[in-house]
């Protein structure tokens, strides 16, 4: 595990129960915890889930896989799955892997939440 990897489970905030903030490195060591948090959210079948990556510094293939699986599950029951707040390093990783074309990505959580309320979801940031 890298020094800035998130060693603890992501914390959901009461005022935004469908927003999952992630921080540090989302890698092989942390992705099982992320997956567990996502599974707990998905079990409730919310109409939307927003992943806040504004404090995440790195993501590897295990982290990407956790997000892809979650997105597929959410969209499978008719929900919406958004990513928000990607910093330049993460944005580059998503662009290189072309996953920026797969995920709905927004500049911040508020924009993602607003988009999830509208009937038309337009741009990826």
PLM region spans:
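Short, low-complexity, intrinsically disordered N-terminal peptides in bacterial proteins
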Residues: 1-6, 122-125
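STAS-typified acidic loop motif
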Residues: 3-36
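Short leucine-rich amphipathic alpha-helices used at interfaces
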Residues: 8-9, 48, 117
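Conserved catalytic submotifs in the C-terminal HATPase_c
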Residues: 15, 54, 110
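Amphipathic alpha-helical interaction surfaces in cytosolic regulatory modules
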Residues: 25-103
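A charged, well-structured terminal subsegment
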Residues: 105-125
């Amino acid at each position: 595990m890298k020094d800035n990897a998130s060693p603890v489970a992501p914390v959901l905030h009461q005022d935004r129960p469908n927003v999952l903030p992630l921080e540090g490195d989302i890698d092989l060591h942390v992705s099982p915890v992320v997956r567990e948090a996502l599974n707990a959210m998905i079990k409730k079948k919310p109409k939307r889930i927003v992943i806040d990556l504004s404090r995440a510094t790195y993501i590897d293939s295990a982290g990407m896989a956790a997000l892809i699986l979650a997105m597929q599950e959410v969209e499978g029951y008719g929900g919406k799955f958004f990513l928000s707040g990607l910093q330049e390093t993460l944005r580059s990783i998503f662009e290189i892997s072309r996953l920026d074309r797969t995920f709905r990505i927004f500049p911040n959580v508020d924009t993602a939440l607003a988009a999830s309320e509208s009937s038309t979801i337009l741009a990826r940031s």
